[in-house]
Swiss-Prot record:
Subcellular localization: Nucleus
Highest classification ranks of the organism: Eukaryota, Fungi, Dikarya, Ascomycota, Taphrinomycotina
Gene: rhp57
Residues that, per the record, bind ATP: 100-107
CDD domains hit by this protein: XRCC3 (cd19491)
Organism: Schizosaccharomyces pombe (strain 972 / ATCC 24843) (Fission yeast)
Predominant location: nucleus
Any GO BP annotation: double-strand break repair via homologous recombination
Protein known as: DNA repair protein rhp57
Length: 354
């Protein structure tokens, strides 16, 4: 039974455990199926099943919290205008996605946050370490050290002892996960251990779509039912990933930032498919609409979109009058701020509003 995925150190009677394995009953099945159906599939008594359901329900129920006890914490982006746009910065205890096409500055933004989290509370940091989980290439440490050298320019009025980080890489844990199996192992098992050993304030996953695209892409040579099975499997894996990261973020008061890839968005004839179709409605939560010159759509679909709290987009734009290219930092949706655009630049100091 998969109860260990939801509750740590839960004692499970071996007899009942084997009965659940033979009956292929999951934790979700135990909590949702009719008691007579559970009896039929596990051959356990009704009293045993009801007792188990009560125990697990108590362990999984959310902790009561009144609105007066809720406190919002944020991690600074390193730029005053971006922080104001986000109503404080990157929210702590939530999942934040940063999406954009190749070369838009996603990795730059993530590395910048790895430095910001090391800053003291007085500067909007958390005085904690960062975890950088990469799925495509290792962390660009040369660029990380360059950003650290230019921190005095970003904070000219701050006390130098607060902003000079001699060894910025010492408080950035990094690992390369080239496949989905290693990624799941790191996040499910090793990351919680690291949280207990050190003060972690930020987790970066760059990027979330890479391994899922590689291992669960559609195989047109196989049957349609196999494709549907892959889609369902990917949806379950994405839900589990989001739940694990969200739980860690909430328990340890950490910010979680996930970089996501995008693909081209093909405009459709909405008169034919209707205004309530997903293609039309997705303009309001994808980050691009049909008025953009080259509309994109974030990877991993609606399942992933429903699992993140905040979506940010880095958009490349070219001025038709001057033919000059620029970048836009867009708040697509967030519980803390409305949809807004800020023009940004990338330089030696990192990403800043301009």
């Amino acid at each position: 039974m998969d109860i260990s995925n939801y509750v740590d150190n839960f004692y499970f009677d071996e007899k009942i455990a084997s009965a659940f394995e033979l009956g292929e009953v999951s934790t979700v099945d135990l909590l949702t199926l009719d008691i007579t159906e559970l009896e039929r599939r596990t051959h356990c008594s009704q009293s045993e099943l009801l007792q188990l359901i009560e125990q697990i329900s108590l362990l999984l129920q959310p902790v009561r919290c009144s609105a007066s006890k809720v406190t919002s914490k944020y991690l600074t982006t390193g730029d005053v205008k971006l922080d104001e746009t986000l109503h404080g910065g990157i929210p702590v205890g939530q999942l934040t996605e940063i999406c954009g096409e190749s070369g838009s500055g996603k990795s730059q933004f993530c590395m910048q946050l790895c430095l910001m989290v090391q800053l003291p509370l007085s500067l909007g940091g958390m005085n904690k370490a960062a975890v950088f989980i990469s799925t495509e290439s290792g962390l660009e440490t040369k660029r990380l050290f360059e950003l650290a050298r230019y921190l005095p320019e970003r904070y000219p009025k701050a006390d130098k002892k607060d902003i000079i980080i001699k060894n910025p890489g010492d408080r950035v844990y990094t690992i390369l996960c080239p496949d989905l199996e290693s990624q799941e192992h790191i996040i499910q098992y090793q990351l919680p251990i690291l949280f207990n050993r050190d003060k972690i304030g930020l987790v970066i996953l760059d990027s979330v779509a890479s391994n899922y695209r590689a291992e669960l892409r559609y195989n047109r040579s196989k049957s349609h039912f196999r494709d549907l099975d892959n889609i369902a499997k990917r949806g379950n894996q994405l839900g589990k990933l989001a739940m694990t990261l969200r739980t860690l973020a909430h328990q340890h008061e950490a910010a979680v930032v996930i970089a996501n890839q995008v693909s081209d968005r093909i405009p459709r004839d909405y008169d034919a498919i209707g205004l309530f179709s997903l293609d039309y409605q997705s303009q309001w939560f994808s980050g691009w609409d049909d008025t953009d010159p080259n509309p994109k759509i974030p990877s991993l679909g609606l399942v992933w979109t429903n699992n993140i709290s905040t979506r940010l987009a880095l958009i490349k734009k070219t001025d038709s009058a001057t033919n000059n290219s620029g970048r836009i930092f867009r708040v697509v949706y967030s519980p803390n701020s409305p949809r807004l655009d800020v023009r940004i630049c990338i330089g030696s100091v990192g990403i800043y509003s301009c």
